[in-house]
């Protein structure tokens, strides 16, 4: 047997304190204390007794602050000194130990005073004594802790720094919880609480930074270096990082009751080898690679060990691991083979899942050099046996691979409780076994097979059990399903690794997701769920419990980078409602972001009692109300506080418990009412609560049909509007209002915003110099009520708003500023517009328009606001001035063009009438002349806004003046034409038909009568005035041979007719006063227009248009803005008749009160465009 010493036989911290070890019946009982022992005991205490009170204070005294003297504190310093090979100078060492002794003495006085006060809490003297003792303790710690961070000794002093920091945080938590009962005022308590939350982060980041510095310092290339590196990592995890990981639990307002935490990080005992003292050159990287990469936690079920032999020596050559996911919530899985599958002896299966798992290994090492010269100089460094001991309260037999040994894992990872046998007081259990192996070198053969034992803290339970009386923290790495994500190394202060959920890449099927199994012993307890996370951007996350979504909203960014995380880089979000275990036995987080990743640290389940819930709701309501105002005196609202948010805060206050906080509720109610009044005062919109539409459009809302006003529901507290879809884009559903010029300030940016419950194809416009446009699609959230014990209906049928939409991020930009069609992640929308100079005479104002022009479109929106955002400065000011100048230049050009067009149009209109009273048409005025004049009237640009044609434009007055006269002309013309449906626009209505005829619509959009057969006849009886004169005017076209005839006659004689033929020479008929000239001549005279009368222009609601969202583009273009719906206001661009149509007239004087108009032909086809019988003027 080789006498080379085993380096594991003398671990530095054991050598420092030289403890006595007694072996009683195979059990190890420590009678001495090392820094590792003390730290493990403290961690156990913090994990199990983290409740404010005398029990906690006295517990710290019993574990460390009441029993330590100079030698024990010196042991903490020596431990790290030896690990990093750096000795602290005598002055700094003595100063640190003296400070620690002073703190210990002072804390014992503090603890005794606390015990006496807790026994008689109303005693004024004891209350005053506690105030004195707290101030003394806090001052001493504030002064002492910087002395444990002496320059150049930050690493050697790190473990005592953390002990002092832990003490300071516990004292600050005491005053946060008990300060009011001690007699401190609220301001002092709040100030100390702020110190507490600030120092949690400061102490944490300091400890992790110098831990990493020390770890980097001890790294080296060889096996000896790695042993020291691993020892530093393992021991400072136990003495520093584990304690730091529990610092956040000192936040007494976030964790007001007992909190159950779990440490999922793994530590590693050294490779179980003899002669592992540095002869293995350059092996440190290989050893480190043999450790598992970050992973979801699993449960070690069994180890199947294979045996090989070399020259008669049997050894552990390889193994396979069988494991289960946490909670045994899935099938068992097998890891790839570690090492080699030797067959020198039968494989042996070690069952790890007995009792509480394997807590201890006793290994036998083997080192041999069979030959010592030449190429046969061989080294065999292996393990030839191990005993696996189970954690249990009974004497459960150990499992043994080949034989037990003397290399004890408890020498490196001691128990956390030395007052009981190690099988009960153990601190860690075996979680995995990997292997370091090495092959051949240049001059010798080296066989190295070193199993690497990984250990996890016993607080990381097999199942995720949710306590009914404590806040339960479940690390995300205890999940059993991870999709599009990864497990990453923890930063050192989280107690384990983290889960990163990747972005979906805008593919909803690829959203990162982590799922965690949970178990509830109590089925009646209600819980809220809180998640600790880190993100560099505002990110939309969804939390599901079972099949129900309990949280879905955008949470704010917490970090500037996800690399080198600091404690301040993590934030929390929480479900607003409480739920029972009936929702299911899984909880998960899904990343809805298409572009950003998120890191999930842990889930927290907070049990809700009536008192706790009332306190939570009151605190939440107070924070929400105070956050509305710019200052504590409530003089003004924050700009980013929306009207919708105020309503939701009001809901929070409304549903506070009258039983627990009636006075506070009344006070908060007055504050939120004041906030609502301030919101109304700054809102420039009239009737923002939608009391009525179209009552006074000039002073409120105007709108179309298809709009309904609905009362509040579980989303909206006040009235909101619903806009439905439309079957014709020329008749959209719309809602509009004008912001009067008198309400606007010069050179100021204004913002339109509101809340959209859901929408499809909702177009939003702000119009001043141009149209700022946004198309918004907001998917509906469905019911706001996931499966829960609460009902969405109140006892009187009113909506229950106990779960308002308060997950609100004021920093989130909810708008698509470039005018593109987009789906908002948020239901909040905003659109801004800049105002340049103001002119009350011009009264340009700002038009606000909501419009839907598709069949599938719809929208539900409310809490609309138009408010001042900020004065314009710098580039924004220059931009609006430039935009206004361009607008005015084009406006001047438009005025010049309008004067010319108006003059021409007016002349055309005036020519239709006899006089300026416009009450009588000229005798020769025909329908073509009226349409030609109408076309010229419609050539006036900017009569109405293209975005919504019910809104008048700059030329509305002159357009309506002339258009009114056109309507008068049509009316007068109708009055003197006694034939009904003479243009066949209504088919054959009013006409009698014999035989087969058709009414066809030509390509020029004209309806014509087609008589294809000689035996067909179309007629109409017309009443006339005997003795008066009439003009029969017909426009028609003859195809083929024969003649087309339009006859007028009475019962007896008095017959006349107009004949049409496909002839070249002009025909003269008796009494015919007009020759058969080509009709296009008349068209040219009147501009080629022949437009029909249609709906009145007031019925035309809209125009599709494409508008950029910057001022310089498309404000007033030089050409006419295209408007395919313009004919719906009374104008349709009739093209001239094709060549061949002629118009003929004859005079007729009836002798009776009835005449007949008959249309027929002799052969071929006769096409009639119009028939008119006009009463002559007297």
Swiss-Prot record:
Q: Which domain of life is it from?
A: Bacteria
CDD domains assigned: delta_endotoxin_C
Query: What Pfam families does this protein map onto?
Result: Cry1Ac_D5, Cry1Ac_dom-VII, Endotoxin_C, Endotoxin_M, Endotoxin_N
* Family of this protein: Belongs to the delta endotoxin family.
Spell out the protein name for this chain.
Pesticidal crystal protein Cry1Ac
Q: What does this protein do?
A: Promotes colloidosmotic lysis by binding to the midgut epithelial cells of many lepidopteran larvae.
Entry keywords, A to Z: Genetically modified food, Plasmid, Sporulation, Toxin, Virulence
Query: Which Gene3D superfamilies does the record associate with it?
Result: Galactose-binding domain-like, Pesticidal crystal protein, central domain, Pesticidal crystal protein, N-terminal domain
| Keyword Acetylation listed | no
Mention any additional remark.
Toxic segment of the protein is located in the N-terminus.
Describe the applications of the protein: Introduced by genetic manipulation and expressed in insect-resistant cotton and tomato by Calgene (Monsanto) and in maize by Dekalb Genetics.
Q: Does the keyword Metal-binding apply?
A: no
Organism classification, top ranks?
Answer: Bacteria, Bacillati, Bacillota, Bacilli, Bacillales
Give GO terms for biological process.
sporulation resulting in formation of a cellular spore; symbiont-mediated killing of host cell
Molecular-function annotations in GO: signaling receptor binding; toxin activity
């Amino acid at each position: 047997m080789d006498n080379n010493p085993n380096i594991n036989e003398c671990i530095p911290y054991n050598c420092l304190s030289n403890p006595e070890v007694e072996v009683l019946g195979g059990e190890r009982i420590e009678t001495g204390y090392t820094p590792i022992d003390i730290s493990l005991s403290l961690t156990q205490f913090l994990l199990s007794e983290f409740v404010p009170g005398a029990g906690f204070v006295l517990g710290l005294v019993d574990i460390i602050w009441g029993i330590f003297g100079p030698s024990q504190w010196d042991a903490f310093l020596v431990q790290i000194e030896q690990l990093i090979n750096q000795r602290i100078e005598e002055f700094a060492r003595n100063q640190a130990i003296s400070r620690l002794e002073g703190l210990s003495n002072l804390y014992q006085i503090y603890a005794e005073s606390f015990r006496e006060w807790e026994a008689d809490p109303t005693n004024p003297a004891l209350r005053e004594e506690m105030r004195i003792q707290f101030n003394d303790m806090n001052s001493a710690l504030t002064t002492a802790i910087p002395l444990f961070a002496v320059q150049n000794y930050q690493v050697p002093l790190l473990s005592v720094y953390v002990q002092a920091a832990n003490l300071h945080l516990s004292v600050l938590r005491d005053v946060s919880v008990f300060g009011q009962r001690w007699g401190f005022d609220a301001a002092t308590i709040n100030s100390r609480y702020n110190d507490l939350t600030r120092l949690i982060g400061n102490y944490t980041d300091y400890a992790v930074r110098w831990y990493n510095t020390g770890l980097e310092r001890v790294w080296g290339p060889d096996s000896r270096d790695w042993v020291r590196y691993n020892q530093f990592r393992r021991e400072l995890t136990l003495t520093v990082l584990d304690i730091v990981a529990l610092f956040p639990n000192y936040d007494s307002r976030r964790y007001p009751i007992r909190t159950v935490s779990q440490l999922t990080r793994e530590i590693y005992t050294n490779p179980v080898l003899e002669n592992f003292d540095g002869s293995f050159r350059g092996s440190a990287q290989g050893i480190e690679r043999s450790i598992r990469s970050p992973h979801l936690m699993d449960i070690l079920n069994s180890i199947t060990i294979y045996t090989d032999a070399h020259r008669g020596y049997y050894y552990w050559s390889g193994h396979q691991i069988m494991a289960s996911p946490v909670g045994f919530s899935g099938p068992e899985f097998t890891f790839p083979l570690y090492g080699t599958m030797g067959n020198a002896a039968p494989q042996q299966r070690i069952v790890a899942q007995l009792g509480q798992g394997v807590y201890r290994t006793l290994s036998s090492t083997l080192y041999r050099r069979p030959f010592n010269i030449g190429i046969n100089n061989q080294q065999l460094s292996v393990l030839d046996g191990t005993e696996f001991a189970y954690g249990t309260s009974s004497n459960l037999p150990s499992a043994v691979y080949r034989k037990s040994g003397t290399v004890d894992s408890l020498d490196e990872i001691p128990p956390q409780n030395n007052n009981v046998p190690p099988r009960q007081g153990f601190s860690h259990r075996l979680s995995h076994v990997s292997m370091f192996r090495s092959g051949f070198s240049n001059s010798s053969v080296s066989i190295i097979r070193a199993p690497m034992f990984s250990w996890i803290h016993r607080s990381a339970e097999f199942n995720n059990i949710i306590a009914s009386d404590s806040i339960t923290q479940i690390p995300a790495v205890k999940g059993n399903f991870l999709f599009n994500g990864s497990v990453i190394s923890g930063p050192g202060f989280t107690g384990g690794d983290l889960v990163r959920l990747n972005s979906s890449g805008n593919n909803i099927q690829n959203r990162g997701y982590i799922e965690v199994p949970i178990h509830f012993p109590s089925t009646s307890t209600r819980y809220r769920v809180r998640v600790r996370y880190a993100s560099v951007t505002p990110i939309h996350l969804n939390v599901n419990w079972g099949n129900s979504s309990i949280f879905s909203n955008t949470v704010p960014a917490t970090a500037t980078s996800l690399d080198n995380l600091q404690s301040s880089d993590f934030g929390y979000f929480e479900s607003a409602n409480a739920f029972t275990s009936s929702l299911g036995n899984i909880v998960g987080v899904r990343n809805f972001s298409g572009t950003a990743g998120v890191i999930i640290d842990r889930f927290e389940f907070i049990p809700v009692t009536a008192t706790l819930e009332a306190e939570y709701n009151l605190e939440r309501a107070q924070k929400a109300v105070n956050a509305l105002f710019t200052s504590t005196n409530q003089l003004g609202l924050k700009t980013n506080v929306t009207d919708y948010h105020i309503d939701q805060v009001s809901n929070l206050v409304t549903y506070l418990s009258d039983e627990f906080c009636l006075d506070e509720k009344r006070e908060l109610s007055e504050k939120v009412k004041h906030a609502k009044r301030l919101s109304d005062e700054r809102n420039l919109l009239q009737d923002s609560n939608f009391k009525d539409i179209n009552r006074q459009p000039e002073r409120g809302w105007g709108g179309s049909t298809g709009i309904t006003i609905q009362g509040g529901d579980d989303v909206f507290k006040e009235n909101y509007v619903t806009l439905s879809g439309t079957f014709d884009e020329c008749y959209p559903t719309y809602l509009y209002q004008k912001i009067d010029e008198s309400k606007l300030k010069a050179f100021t940016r204004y913002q339109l915003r509101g809340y959209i419950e859901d929408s499809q194809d909702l177009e939003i416009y702000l119009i001043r110099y141009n149209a700022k446009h946004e198309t918004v699609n907001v998917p509906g959230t469905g019911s706001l009520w996931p499966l829960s014990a609460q009902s969405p209906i109140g006892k009187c049928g009113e909506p229950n708003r106990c779960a308002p939409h308060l997950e609100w991020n004021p920093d989130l930009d909810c708008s698509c500023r470039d005018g593109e069609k987009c789906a908002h992640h948020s239901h909040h929308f905003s659109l801004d517009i800049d105002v340049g100079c103001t002119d009350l005479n011009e009264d340009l104002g700002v038009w606000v328009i909501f419009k839907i022009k598709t069949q599938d479109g719809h929208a539900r929106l409310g809490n609309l606001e138009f408010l001042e955002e900020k004065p314009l400065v710098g580039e924004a000011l220059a931009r609006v001035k430039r935009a206004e100048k361009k607008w005015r230049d084009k406006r001047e050009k438009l005025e010049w063009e309008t004067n010319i067009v108006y003059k021409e149009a007016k002349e055309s209109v005036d020519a239709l009438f006899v006089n300026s009273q416009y009450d009588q048409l000229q005798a020769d005025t025909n329908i073509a002349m009226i349409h030609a004049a109408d076309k010229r009237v419609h050539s006036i640009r900017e009569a109405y806004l293209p975005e919504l044609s019910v809104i008048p434009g700059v030329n509305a007055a002159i357009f309506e003046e002339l258009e009114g006269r056109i309507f008068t002309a049509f009316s007068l013309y109708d009055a003197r034409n006694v034939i009904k449906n003479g243009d066949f626009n209504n088919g054959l209505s009013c006409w009698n038909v014999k035989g087969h005829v058709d009414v066809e619509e030509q390509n020029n959009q004209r309806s014509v009568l087609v008589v294809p057969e000689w035996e067909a006849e179309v007629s109409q009886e017309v009443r006339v005035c005997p003795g008066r004169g009439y003009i029969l005017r017909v426009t028609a076209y003859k195809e083929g041979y024969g003649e087309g005839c339009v006859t007028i006659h009475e019962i007896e004689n008095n017959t006349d007719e107009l004949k049409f033929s496909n002839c070249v020479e002009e025909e003269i008929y008796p009494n015919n006063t007009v020759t058969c000239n080509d009709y296009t001549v008349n068209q040219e005279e009147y501009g080629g227009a022949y437009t029909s009368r249609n709906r009145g222009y007031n019925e035309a609601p809209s125009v599709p248009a494409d508008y950029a969202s910057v001022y310089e583009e498309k404000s007033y273009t030089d050409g006419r803005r295209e408007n395919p719906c313009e004919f719906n206001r009374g104008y349709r661009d009739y093209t001239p008749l094709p060549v061949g149509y002629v118009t003929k007239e004859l005079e007729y004087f009836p002798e009776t009160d009835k005449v007949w108009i008959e249309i027929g032909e002799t052969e071929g086809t006769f096409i009639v465009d119009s028939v008119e019988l006009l009463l002559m003027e007297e």
